[in-house]
Amino acid sequence: MASLNSDVIMGESSSISVPSSSSKNSKRFELKKWSAVALWAWDIVVDNCAICRNHIMDLCIECLANQASATSEECTVAWGVCNHAFHFHCISRWLKTRQVCPLDVCEWEFQKYGH
């Protein structure tokens, strides 16, 4: 009876070709190059900041304006308990005048911020 590792197909015919012992040890294929591809996205429904309208993974308008300066900070994302996400700079500027979420007008409370 053929083992599970061989390429022999068991059928009703009387002639069965069994691979020789030398072909069992040879490689069936050799991997010479492997290029991995991966995609990711934020776990949010809307992927644009509703304040500056830039993509949430891109720089906010404040960071874009200060891009030439040597002290440009990292542009992070801030989530509220309502699960709306904004650039941290954008929501900080918004919260100086109103303490509510710009989208659902619920009282703003940080759930998390950073990448």
UniProtKB/Swiss-Prot annotation:
One of its GO terms (molecular function) is zinc ion binding. Residues 13-24 have a biased composition (Low complexity). Keywords: Cytoplasm, Metal-binding, Nucleus, Ubl conjugation pathway, Zinc, Zinc-finger. GO terms for biological process: auxin-activated signaling pathway; jasmonic acid mediated signaling pathway; protein ubiquitination; response to auxin; response to jasmonic acid. Zn(2+) 1 binds at C49, C52, H87. A zinc finger (RING-type) spans 60-107. Residues 1-26 are annotated as: Disordered. This is RING-box protein 1b. The gene is RBX1B.
